Amino acid sequence: MSTHILPEAFTQPQPCSQPPKEVHLVTPSERQVPYSGHVKPFIMVTTRPEHEAARDEYESFLTQSGLSRNELQHIALEEVDFFGSFTAADVSGVLIGASPYNADTPTAEKTRSQLHVEDQVRELLAVILKEGIPLLATGVVLQVLAAYLGTGTREEFGEELGAVDLFLTAEGREDPVLAGLPQAVTVFAGHYEGVGEVPAHATLLASSPDCPVQMLRVGRNVYACQFNPELDAARFEQRVNIYDEAGYGDPDMSEDILSHARSSEVHDAGQIIRNFVSHFSRT
C-alpha cells in the first residue's frame, strides 16, 4: 500500500494557523447555548447512504456540539460536492461521520455509492491535511485516514456493536480535545475491521483491548476516532433501530445488543465534540 507524503508541517507537531487557546469544558446543560454568530461555521459531513440515518447522525452531533444549525452546517457526500461549497478560509473545522461501509471490502464488491464516498473522503482528507483545517472524523473514516498514511486494517481488530471500554494514552490525557474525560472511558462503537498499528506521523490518543487504535491525532488539529462520540444511550438505540428497519440488522440480536447497552455505564463522550468545537472555533 502506498504512503502519501504529508506536508512538512505534519511530520512534527506544529501549531495550527490559529494560536492555541484554553478549552472551556462545556457541560451538557450548557451545550444548547449557541456560539456567537461571528464564529465561522463548522461543517458536518455525513457519509451514510441512508437519509434517515444521516439526518439522525447530524442531529446527534448538533446536540452534542452546542452549536446552532447555522454554526454546524450539514453536507451529505452522496449529494453535495464539498469543494464546490466551501474553502478552507470559510470554516472553523470539519466533522466527518461514520458509515456502514467496510474499508477492506474488495473493490469489485463495493457499490457505486461506497466508491464515490471513499473517493470524496480521500480527496477531503488530502485538502484538510494540506490546508491545516481542523478535523474530527469518526468510524470508518479513521480507517480511511490510516490507509492514506500507509497503514491497513484487519478483521481481528473489529468490535461487536455496543459499549466498549477504552483507555487514554499519556498523550491522550494531555490532549485538549480529550480534556475532562477519565483515563478509562466507556463509549459506543461497532466495526468489522480496525487499525492495529499507529500510522506514520500520527499520535495514539486512545486504545481498547480489542482495537489498539481507537483514537489518533495527526499534527495538532486532525483527529479521528473509531468509536461514535455523538451517541448517548438513547441515540444509540435509535441508530440500531434505524438500521434494523433498513434491513441491515437481526432484530433478535439487536434486542440483545440494546439490553446490554442499557445496562452499561457509558461516559459522556460528547465532551470530545464540545472540546473540539471550543478549541478550534474561530472568527
Label every model-predicted segment.
Residues E52, A103-T105, A146:
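Glycine/Thr-rich phosphate-binding loops of Rossmann-like dinucleotide-binding domains
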Residues N70-L136:
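Flexible gly/pro-rich beta->alpha loop and the following alpha-helix that scaffold active-site loops
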Residues P34-H38, F42-E57, L62-G66, A76-E78:
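N-terminal beta1-alpha1 ligand-phosphate binding loop
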Residues V141-V144, Y148-F188:
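Ligand/cofactor pocket segment of small-molecule handling proteins
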Residues T3, T27-H38, M44, D90, ...:
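Amide-donor transfer/coupling interface in amidating biosynthetic enzymes
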Residues E8-A9, E22-V26, V33:
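Acidic, Ala/Val/Gly-enriched low-complexity intrinsically disordered segments
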